[in-house]
């Protein structure tokens, strides 16, 4: 399965609680942290919800 690298680049302060919960569900603990996740439809849906807070890269 393909992998994607997600980097959290913008704080959740001032945004809705569910967006902060989505950031935590993706596995982030600190700002500017990167995580590698499987490229699945569930992960893609979470990324769409917080697309203004993260940067996405494909891992080969």
Swiss-Prot record:
GO cellular component labels: cytosolic large ribosomal subunit
Family per similarity comment: Belongs to the universal ribosomal protein uL30 family.
InterPro entries for this protein: Ribo_uL30_ferredoxin-like_sf, Ribosomal_uL30_bac-type, Ribosomal_uL30_ferredoxin-like
Molecular function GO terms recorded: structural constituent of ribosome
UniProt entry keywords in alphabetical sequence: Ribonucleoprotein, Ribosomal protein
One Pfam entry name: Ribosomal_L30
Lineage: Bacteria, Bacillati, Chloroflexota, Dehalococcoidia, Dehalococcoidales
CDD domains assigned to the protein according to its UniProt record, in alphabetical order: Ribosomal_L30
Coiled-coil region: none
GO biological process: translation
NCBIfam families for the chain: rpmD_bact
Annotated protein name in UniProt: Large ribosomal subunit protein uL30
Signal peptide start and end residues: none
UniProt xrefs under HAMAP family: Ribosomal_uL30_B
Gene that encodes the chain: rpmD
Superkingdom to which the source organism belongs: Bacteria
Species this chain originates from: Dehalococcoides mccartyi (strain ATCC BAA-2100 / JCM 16839 / KCTC 5957 / BAV1)
Alphabetical list of PANTHER family matching this protein: LARGE RIBOSOMAL SUBUNIT PROTEIN UL30M, MITOCHONDRIAL RIBOSOMAL PROTEIN L30
Summary of subunit composition and partner proteins: Part of the 50S ribosomal subunit.
């Amino acid at each position: 399965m393909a992998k994607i690298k997600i980097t959290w680049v913008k704080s959740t302060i001032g945004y809705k609680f569910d967006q902060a919960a989505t950031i935590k569900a993706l596995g982030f603990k600190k700002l500017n942290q990167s995580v590698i996740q499987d490229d699945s439809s569930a992960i893609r849906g979470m990324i769409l919800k917080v697309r203004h807070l993260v940067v996405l890269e494909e891992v080969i």
